[in-house]
Amino acid sequence: MSAKQDGSTAESRKAPHSYRERVNSTVELAALVYRPLTASGALLSILRGKLYRRRSVRNVLDVVAVRSISGGQGHSAESKVRVEYLTPAEGNANGNSISNISAAPCADIRGSSDTAATSSSPSTPAQPTLLEGRCKMCLLDPTVLKATELCPDPASAAQHCTPVFLLGAAVVGSHVTRQLEAAVQAGQLSRKAADLLQQLHERLAGGPSSVSLTEDTDGSEQPQGLPRAAAAPPPPSNKRRASYTGAVEVTFTPRAVELNYQAYTMSELLSMVLPLREHADLVALSGFEQVGHIAHVNLSAAHLPYADIIGQVILDCNETVSVVVNKVDAISSVFREFKMDIIGLRRRTDSVDGNVVAGADLDDAGEAGGSLTAAERQAIALEALSPTYSLAEARVHRLLTATVRQHGCSFRVPYNRVYWNSRLSFEHTRLVDRMRPGDVLFDVMAGVGPFAVPAAKKGVQVFANDLNPVAAQYMKVNAELNHLPANALHVFNMDGRDFLNSVLFTSVTRAADASLPGHLCTGRRHVTMNLPAIAVEFLDVFQPLSSTCAPASEQRCNASAAAVVNERWNHLPAHVDPNAIDRRTLFHVYCFSAAEDLITDAVRQVEVNLGYTLPPENIEETLMVRDVAPTKRMMCVSFTLPPAFWKNLLASRPGQGGEPGGAHAETASTLVEVEQAAKKARPDKM
């Protein structure tokens, strides 16, 4: 673990807060105000997809229209009467908010409306000069209508409301057209705004719905002109549209909306605060992997100067994230953990807009908090006994221990000390779903148990191994966390080859005492080897003795260099009953491939390291698990050991008169010769 020290981390964490001020802005929008409120269903249905959309911004507001007196000079007393649209909260604050919007003077409105009213039919409701009382305000998307497009004069549009118009089924269509045209001629309404109101009236009155906001060829919504002829009827729809048969009073007004960092998505914020245009090597961050409360990113060298800002943006946009870490080096350790820096940390004292935000603290016990299991407390106690133990390192360990839920199970993951990949959750589920109660699972590279724990919970007898002692310890923690029976999951901490040569061998050949766990299997034996960078190399334990090569023994961990890794599977004990050997044991081996023919290459990698050719009937399944890189895939080959292997093993039994490996030396040699042609993955891409 290469986490930053407390002092440097705290100092660098002060800088990112300034980015929030840099993204603050105010946007002027066109707003449609209407009453009565009972028309909301019909109007909002018509406006669906046309409203302003931004995170943390309400596009439909409850407002109160109240009269106020203008302080301007040169007007009559009557012309000084104006209207302000206040939200309830703003009304309580005496209208001091930036959101208080003033309407045009009454005299200006009456001048245009009186002309239209004189020619209206007796059945047409009287046109109001001002909206008063409770109203609804809908913020319109700028692609539909901009605030500067409300009136022909942009300066006037930014300061005043338009006149009040009557729309709907209770209003004669010719009257609507005349009042809109009069407002356009008087310079109180732009043609684009008039077109929009005409379209709203047609929809409210039940006219042709094709006279509406339509989509241009590029998919953007564009307002169309006033109707001149009847259009084709709308296509039938299964959705019931809300209807309103009364008159609706509407007006347009500009609305100032304050935007802060909460109004933007993570990708939008990063594109705003990072100088992407100034640096060609600086590209937008594609995303992150989340493991419990931890967000994991892989930053390039160009991103590193902005690591603290990136960490803060991730925290601000993801409430479930408390810690952000950056992968410093590639995975190179035999324990498969990687070095990381903490670039973002949400403290319990952090606040957003004055509100305290709950999160992790460096003194926390990670996400587990006070709910540690007995096995986890034991693991922590053992760590404290280490000669290299330090309180600061222990705090970091607790901070980076996450709780992950997957496949109906909970996993405690010490993320900085074990290997965990959340992108493999589907594969964990897929493989466990193949198993049935009564099966036995041998997980050679088990990690903290993403295969082992759900399989044991399903009723499968599990023998799980990992070379990493921390992973082995946390398998026990996760067994306790998921309330597994004591005999359901057996944990081992040894080299994978030793596990194959001991635990698996005694179970498959029934060489152990019948009373030992794993000897009896009423279902099928499964062997998982999920270490795609080098898992196929562990298959050398099954090679015939004649094909043993130096690299196999050189790569063996925690074993004598002089030992022959495949000796156990080439010498069958005399007391073993050949008929009791389980030849149906199914191996699931993972590897990487960059070849054009992924399936052929994956099988070839297995054959090269196994030392035997796999007949088609022994290959049960070969599939691509996921994309690792543009030209690199993770593969899984599920197979049983071929007849040639079992024939060689039986020939090695004392008293059979055979020489192990002799009958198949030619096949094995041929495979070993082409080993260099097999696609090998680099260990740092595990």
Swiss-Prot record:
Function of the molecule: Specifically methylates the N1 position of guanosine-37 in various cytoplasmic and mitochondrial tRNAs. Methylation is not dependent on the nature of the nucleoside 5' of the target nucleoside. This is the first step in the biosynthesis of wybutosine (yW), a modified base adjacent to the anticodon of tRNAs and required for accurate decoding.
Region (Disordered): 206-244
Annotated positions binding S-adenosyl-L-methionine: 428, 466-467, 495-496, 530
Principal place of residence: mitochondrion
Record keyword Repeat present: no
Classification of source organism: Eukaryota, Discoba, Euglenozoa, Kinetoplastea, Metakinetoplastina
Recorded catalytic activity of this chain's protein: guanosine(37) in tRNA + S-adenosyl-L-methionine = N(1)-methylguanosine(37) in tRNA + S-adenosyl-L-homocysteine + H(+)
The enzyme's E.C. designation: 2.1.1.228
Localization annotation: Mitochondrion matrix; Nucleus; Cytoplasm
Record-level Gene Ontology MF annotations: tRNA (guanine(37)-N1)-methyltransferase activity; tRNA methyltransferase activity
Signal peptide: none
Enzyme class: transferase
GO biological process, one term: tRNA N1-guanine methylation
PANTHER family per UniProt: TRNA (GUANINE(37)-N1)-METHYLTRANSFERASE 2, TRNA METHYLTRANSFERASE
Listed name of the protein: tRNA (guanine(37)-N(1))-methyltransferase
UniProt keyword list: Cytoplasm, Methyltransferase, Mitochondrion, Nucleus, S-adenosyl-L-methionine, Transferase, tRNA processing
Recorded family membership: Belongs to the class I-like SAM-binding methyltransferase superfamily. TRM5/TYW2 family.
Subunit structure: Monomer.
Disulfide bridge map: none
GO cellular component terms, semicolon-separated: cytoplasm; mitochondrial matrix; nucleus
